[in-house]
Every structure is written in C-alpha cells, then in structure tokens.
C-alpha cells in the first residue's frame, strides 16, 4: 500500500498550537510536549478529516474505536515517567499514535490490538513513518507474556475491570 503524507507549515503550526493548549491544561513534561509536537497526528486520520487532527478531542478511527484526545495521551504518558530504554507494553494499539509518542520518548514499545483492521493498517503506517514497535494482534487482557516483564504498562483500551494477568 502506498502512502502519501503531507506535513507542511500548516500542520507543524497546528501541532505547536496543540502543545500550547496542553501546557495550559497542566502538561509539564517537556519530553512529552516535544513528542506531541513532533508526531504528525493527522497521519492517523482519513485525509478527509485532517482538519480535525489537532483539536483536543477524541476522534473515530473505525471499528468502533477512537484516537484518544491529545490531552489524555499527554496526561497518561506524563504519568508513566518514561525513561530512554524503558520496556513498555501498550494494550490497545488503535491508530498507533500513542505508540509513536512512547517511541519518541525512547521507550521500547510492545503494542497489542484486538481489531484486525486497525492492526493491519497500523503495521503498515507506523513503519512507513519510521516507527517500529513490536506489533501483536490479539486479546490485550492477557498482555504479551512472552516478552514480560515490562517496566511500564499503559492500557489505552476500555475494559470493565483490570485483568489479573496485567497486575
């Protein structure tokens, strides 16, 4: 599949504005803000909706899933206190945006997605963008035990309770 992404002054300016909004909302981790300012969020949207990419809102990405609100991504990432080389398990790859933020911070990312269509798109788009987490298709409630232990675990998927396997 061929991708043709554009990232010009308009998108870069929109990312800068988004970073300013996140600062005003209390995000202080400079590494997180720098990562948000670098990762082109519009690449995770259908081109028709690129004008929505830098609003601080969640947005549908198909399969009944959404790309998380940028504030949520920044807040959760800030709470993780990522250090270069941290081994991070992400439950719920979704669009792949959160994985890219973690990779920008120097984490080794292991990400699992249960929706096959999202997984198939993400395993193509992220490497095209230069991001190479370890991808898995499956039930994230069980984690990815063959690569455990992890330094950090982030759950970006909804669940009625925290699975015992992740504790």
Language-model-detected regions and their locations in the chain:
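Conserved nucleotide-cofactor-binding alpha/beta core module
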Residues: 81-167
